[in-house]
């Protein structure tokens, strides 16, 4: 089986949704690079996201984030994980829609909380009531994430690998995004590894 990615796949969703882990596995299975906009921003700024938020503020960060995403979308097709707030920017959303395909990893709040509650690397959760903050962020952001081209409803118990196969299967329904050589013979590509 040979898959060919024609557009960059942009993983969107809440912090803790698995965008980086699932994105890495998806990129591996497709044989394309994996890029992370947060890692690219940190490398360019020589500072962590938390430090950038503290030093320069969220507005400055969002401007730089949009610039980095635009640069990454202009490159060869890859799998790109973006920060939880990146897709909220209308111009960034439009660019992703024009130049790539957005995949929303939709994860239940309890599962998100179980993944992020012990991490100190989430500047937006540095509040007196971080779970309530996470719930409020999800309530605000999910209607915007729902604008993504493809939705994957991640379930508790799904492995990273299984989640990636679900994303790949959804991508295979879009011939403008992914061509799977085995598809013409009736294969669905799930056994490609």
Predicted regions and their residues:
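Conserved lysine of the Walker
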Residues: 19
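Short, well-ordered beta-strand core segments
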Residues: 78, 102-103, 151-152
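P-loop (Walker A) phosphate-binding loop of NTP-binding proteins
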Residues: 14
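Hydrophobic anchor at the beta1->P-loop junction of P-loop NTPases
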Residues: 11
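A glycine- and Lys/Arg-enriched "phosphate-lid" helix/loop adjacent to the NTP-binding pocket
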Residues: 98-143
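NTP-dependent small-molecule kinase module
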Residues: 2-4, 25, 29, 139-193
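ATP-dependent small-molecule kinase phosphotransfer cores
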Residues: 36-97, 121-122, 135
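Hydrophobic positions on the alpha1 helix immediately C-terminal to the Walker A/P-loop
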Residues: 22
């Amino acid at each position: 089986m040979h898959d060919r990615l024609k557009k960059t796949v942009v993983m969107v969703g809440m912090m803790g949704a698995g965008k980086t882990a699932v994105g890495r596995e998806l990129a591996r299975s497709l044989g394309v690079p994996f890029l992370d906009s947060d890692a690219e921003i940190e490398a360019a700024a020589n500072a962590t996201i938390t430090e950038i938020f503290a030093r320069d503020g969220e507005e400055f960060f969002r401007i730089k984030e949009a610039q980095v995403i635009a640069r990454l979308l202009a490159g060869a097709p890859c799998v790109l994980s973006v920060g939880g707030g990146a897709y909220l920017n209308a111009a960034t959303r439009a660019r992703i829609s024009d130049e790539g395909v957005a995949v929303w990893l939709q994860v239940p709040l309890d599962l998100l909380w179980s993944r992020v509650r012990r991490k100190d690397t989430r500047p937006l959760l540095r509040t007196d009531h971080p779970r309530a903050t996470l719930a409020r962020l999800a309530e605000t952001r999910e209607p915007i994430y729902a604008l993504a081209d493809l939705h994957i409803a991640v379930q508790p118990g799904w492995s990273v690998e299984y989640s990636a196969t679900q994303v790949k299967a959804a991508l295979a329904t879009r011939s403008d995004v992914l061509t799977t050589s085995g598809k013409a013979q009736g294969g669905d590509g799930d056994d490609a590894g």
